[in-house]
UniProtKB/Swiss-Prot annotation:
Keyword terms of this UniProt record: Ribonucleoprotein, Ribosomal protein, RNA-binding, rRNA-binding
GO CC field: small ribosomal subunit
Subunit structure as annotated in this protein's UniProt entry: Part of the 30S ribosomal subunit. Contacts protein S5. The interaction surface between S4 and S5 is involved in control of translational fidelity.
Domain of life according to the entry: Bacteria
SUPFAM superfamilies: Alpha-L RNA-binding motif
Ribonucleoprotein among keywords: yes
Function: One of the primary rRNA binding proteins, it binds directly to 16S rRNA where it nucleates assembly of the body of the 30S subunit. With S5 and S12 plays an important role in translational accuracy.
One GO biological process term: translation
Name this polypeptide is given: Small ribosomal subunit protein uS4
Gene3D superfamilies assigned to the protein according to its UniProt record, in alphabetical order: Ribosomal Protein S4 Delta 41, Chain A, domain 1, RNA-binding S4 domain
Protein species of origin: Lactococcus lactis subsp. lactis (strain IL1403)
Length: 203
């Protein structure tokens, strides 16, 4: 299954989350596209609930099913902690996500583009792989030739607050993943246990 590249508002409304981060997609119509009103919801089966939760998280990070599943498999191989939380942590360690968390991009999709286009450095070296796993203490910065890219400067200006597990220097356009996040610091609307149940049945 390929990565979804259609309008983000459709998936935002379908799964009740804001993929843009602004919340505008679901502020006015908090029911799925195609429904004739907010009360016309069908009750999901157990499998349907698990699938919906999985899709909600997958679309939040903008991953293909293969990327998402492979990261889940990696989480099952981590010796400490629960599979669900380890999975959430690995998602957060993706370079495109850290770029987003630092406020260098307004969305994860935009962050992925910045990484792909070579605008981002990790410890001073250009990394153009969005799935690169950032470790605590590593410095994420904008390469010198990209420091005046309007979209990056606009994103930094628009960012009002950042997660407690990252630090950012707006003057240098660089930041650090200070530590791995705690569970209550990321995606509180997600029930990762449903995702674990989904993959346990499928694998």
């Amino acid at each position: 299954m390929s990565r979804y590249t259609g309008p983000s508002w459709k998936q935002s409304r379908r799964y009740g989350i804001s993929l843009s981060g602004s919340g505008k997609e679901i502020a006015r119509r908090n029911y799925v596209p195609g429904q004739h009103g907010p009360n016309n919801r069908s009750k999901l089966s157990e499998y349907g609930l698990q699938l919906a939760e999985k899709q909600k998280l997958r679309f939040s990070y903008g991953l293909s099913e293969r990327q998402f599943r492979n990261l889940y498999i990696a989480a099952t191989k981590v010796k400490e902690g629960t599979v669900g939380f380890n999975f959430m942590t690995l998602l957060e360690q993706r370079l495109d996500n850290v770029v987003f968390r630092l406020g260098l991009a307004t969305t994860r999709r935009q962050a992925r583009q910045f990484v792909n286009h070579g605008h981002i450095l990790v410890d001073g070296k250009r990394v153009d792989i969005p799935s690169f796993r950032v470790q605590p203490g590593q410095v994420i910065s904008v390469r010198e030739k990209s420091m005046k890219v309007p979209a990056i400067l606009e994103a930094v200006e628009a960012t009002k607050g950042r997660a407690n597990f990252v630090s950012f220097d707006a003057d240098k356009l660089e930041g650090t993943l200070v530590r791995l996040p705690e569970r209550d610091e990321i995606n509180p609307e997600i029930n990762e246990a449903l995702i674990v149940e989904f993959y346990n049945k499928m694998m």
